[in-house]
């Protein structure tokens, strides 16, 4: 029930911004969540990709071509792992600098979010209470019908369905009414939050210096990140060359073997 309430609040309030309202007692920063997501995503692609390569090599065509793709894939994985290890400190420094430079702005925004959260919480609690009451009423109405089904024969299934349909429609309509009420109650706070955020960015824009400073620092950090990443990327290029050459030789050998078989027929 709590998950349902929070989901509806997100849908009818401020979208992704509202997620901050309920992310309490979470020591992980937003930057850490982004980095963790990227790591999980890359690892998932790596693992699924290896599975596809293994399935292809196990197939009749894969055995016939004998491209040794799995060996090359493992070499690629090892190369990428080394590069990621080399880039780890560099990217960590970039995220730390960016987090430090935007600390003041994020604190102001979090303060605004917390204020709005305190104002809308009573409406969310009231919505939760009403929804629980509606579910309890629905369960009480449906319970006797379930007993009829257990005691009756198959022909009563249609009768049960006919009885359940209006109850379900009533439940749906009442739920929609509660959701609409919640939407109307939260609308002013949604507008207030958007206005607060717009004001924050407008102050930055009008100040000129602060906004330009953020842009300059971000550009400087990205440039530094690129310079520090060059050695690791060069190592990646050098590591890929033998793998690509091996793959090229395997493909040419497979083509040559296939041509010989065709000519021999």
Curated annotation (Swiss-Prot):
One of its GO terms (biological process) is negative regulation of very-low-density lipoprotein particle remodeling. One of its GO terms (cellular component) is spherical high-density lipoprotein particle. Sequence repeats lie at residues 67-88, 89-110, 111-121, 122-142, 144-165, 166-187, 188-209, 210-230, 231-241, 242-265. Residues 67-265 are annotated as: 10 X approximate tandem repeats. The modification Methionine sulfoxide is found at residue 109. Transmembrane segments: none annotated. Major protein of plasma HDL, also found in chylomicrons. It comes from the Eukaryota. Glycosylated. Palmitoylated. Its main location: secreted. Keywords: Cholesterol metabolism, Glycoprotein, HDL, Lipid metabolism, Lipid transport, Lipoprotein, Oxidation, Palmitate, Phosphoprotein, Repeat, Secreted, Signal, Steroid metabolism, Sterol metabolism, Transport. It is found in: Secreted. One of its GO terms (molecular function) is apolipoprotein A-I receptor binding. Residues 1-18 form the signal peptide. Belongs to the apolipoprotein A1/A4/E family. Participates in the reverse transport of cholesterol from tissues to the liver for excretion by promoting cholesterol efflux from tissues and by acting as a cofactor for the lecithin cholesterol acyltransferase (LCAT). As part of the SPAP complex, activates spermatozoa motility. Homodimer. Interacts with APOA1BP and CLU. Component of a sperm activating protein complex (SPAP), consisting of APOA1, an immunoglobulin heavy chain, an immunoglobulin light chain and albumin. Interacts with NDRG1. Interacts with SCGB3A2. Interacts with NAXE and YJEFN3. This is Apolipoprotein A-I. The lineage of its organism: Eukaryota, Metazoa, Chordata, Craniata, Vertebrata. The gene is APOA1.
């Amino acid at each position: 029930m709590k998950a349902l309430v929070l989901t509806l609040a997100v849908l009818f309030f401020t979208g992704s911004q509202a997620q901050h309202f309920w992310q309490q007692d979470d020591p992980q920063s937003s930057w850490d969540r982004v980095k963790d997501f990227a790591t999980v995503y890359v690892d998932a692609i790596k693992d699924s990709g290896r599975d596809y390569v293994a399935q292809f090599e196990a197939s009749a065509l894969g055995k016939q071509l004998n491209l040794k793709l799995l060996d090359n894939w493992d070499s690629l994985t090892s190369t990428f792992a080394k590069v990621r290890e080399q880039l780890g400190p560099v990217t960590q420094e970039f995220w730390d600098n960016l987090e430090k430079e935007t600390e003041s702005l994020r604190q102001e925004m979090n303060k605004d979010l917390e204020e709005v959260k305190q104002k809308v919480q009573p409406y969310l609690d009231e919505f939760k209470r009403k929804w629980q009451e509606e579910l309890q009423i629905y369960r009480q109405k449906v319970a006797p019908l379930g007993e009829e089904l257990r005691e009756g024969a198959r022909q009563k299934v249609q009768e049960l369905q006919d009885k359940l349909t209006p109850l379900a429609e009533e439940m749906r309509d009442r739920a929609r009414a509660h959701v609409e009420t919640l939407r109307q109650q939260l609308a002013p706070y949604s507008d207030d939050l958007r206005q607060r955020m717009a004001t924050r960015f407008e102050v930055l824009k009008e100040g000129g210096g602060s906004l330009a400073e953020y842009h300059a620092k971000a550009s400087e950090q990205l440039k530094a990140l690129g310079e520090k990443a060059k050695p690791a990327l060069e190592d990646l290029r050098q590591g890929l060359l033998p793998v690509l050459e091996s793959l090229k030789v395997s493909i040419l050998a497979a083509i040559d073997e296939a041509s010989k078989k065709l000519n021999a027929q």
